[in-house]
Design a protein with these regions (language model features):
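C-terminal lobe and adjacent flexible extensions of AdoMet/dcAdoMet transferase-like proteins
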Residues: 192-197
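Short glycine-dipeptide loop
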Residues: 50-51, 120-125
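A short acidic, Gly/Pro-enriched loop at the edge of an enzyme's catalytic core
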Residues: 85-95
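A short SAM/SAH-binding and catalytic strip from SAM-dependent methyltransferases
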Residues: 94-107
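A short glycine-rich, Lys/Arg-flanked "PGG" loop and its adjoining helix->strand segment in the class I
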Residues: 110-122
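Conserved alpha-helix/loop element of class I SAM-dependent methyltransferases that forms part
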Residues: 9-27, 39, 43
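Class I SAM-dependent methyltransferase SAM/SAH-binding core
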Residues: 31-85
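C-terminal alpha-helical "lid/dimerization" subdomain adjacent to the S-adenosyl-L-methionine
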Residues: 129-174, 179-188
Length: 197
């Protein structure tokens, strides 16, 4: 959304992007669910430095087309118009969900997280950056709640449910997956890493 994106752009964008780029290395294959505002794609492509494959999917062809100029210098970037729930045979070292889940109904959140896990290599990871519940004293908590209810009806569930809770049940408690969560900006944003081992 315009207002929420403006908040992140003004105050936190570089830090939020760094959550992703800190987890990615040159030579890896990366799958990104949805195009993102701002400099995410540029930062990821730069970090990968032309090696590995950076695959970006979005259900919207106009969004994909709009992204072309910003990623054109990197030949390892692949763009695809695709429904997130459609499986792929290719396996990736990292799956990125950057402000994707809050746009989806809870049932779709579950489908997309399952697809993300299914797309990982045996030691791959999911990197999910999205909104979370701001702390009680956060100055924009109550205006944001009203805004969400009017314009982002699927965002508020991330206030009350962990991203982990949308993963398939067998993966939530699996000893073969390490879950880590951190928050920033008074709890407004979260980063969840799910690392296979």
């Amino acid at each position: 959304s315009t207002v929420m994106t403006a908040v992140s752009n003004c105050f936190m964008q570089k830090r939020l992007i760094r959550y992703v780029t800190d987890e990615i290395h040159a030579g890896q294959d990366v799958l990104q669910f949805g195009t993102a505002d701002g400099g995410l794609q540029h930062a990821v492509a730069e970090k990968m430095n032309g090696s590995g494959v950076y695959h970006i999917e979005d259900i919207s062809k106009p969004q994909i087309d709009a992204l072309l100029p910003s990623i054109s210098p990197w030949l390892n970037v692949r763009l695809n118009v695709r429904d997130f729930s459609n499986p792929t045979d290719r396996k990736y070292d990292a799956a990125v969900l950057f402000f994707t889940l809050h746009e989806l109904p809870d049932a779709r959140k579950e489908i997309v997280l399952k697809r993300a896990f299914d797309a990982l290599t045996s030691h791959g990871k999911i990197i999910a950056v999205d909104y979370a519940m701001p702390c009680a004293y956060h100055p924009i908590k109550h205006p944001l709640r009203l805004f969400n209810r009017l314009f982002e009806p699927f965002a508020e569930s991330l206030w009350y449910k962990d991203i982990k809770s949308f993963a398939p049940a067998n993966l939530r408690e699996s000893k073969n997956i390490i879950w880590a969560k951190s928050t920033t900006f008074g709890g407004l944003y979260q980063c969840v890493i799910a690392q296979k081992r």
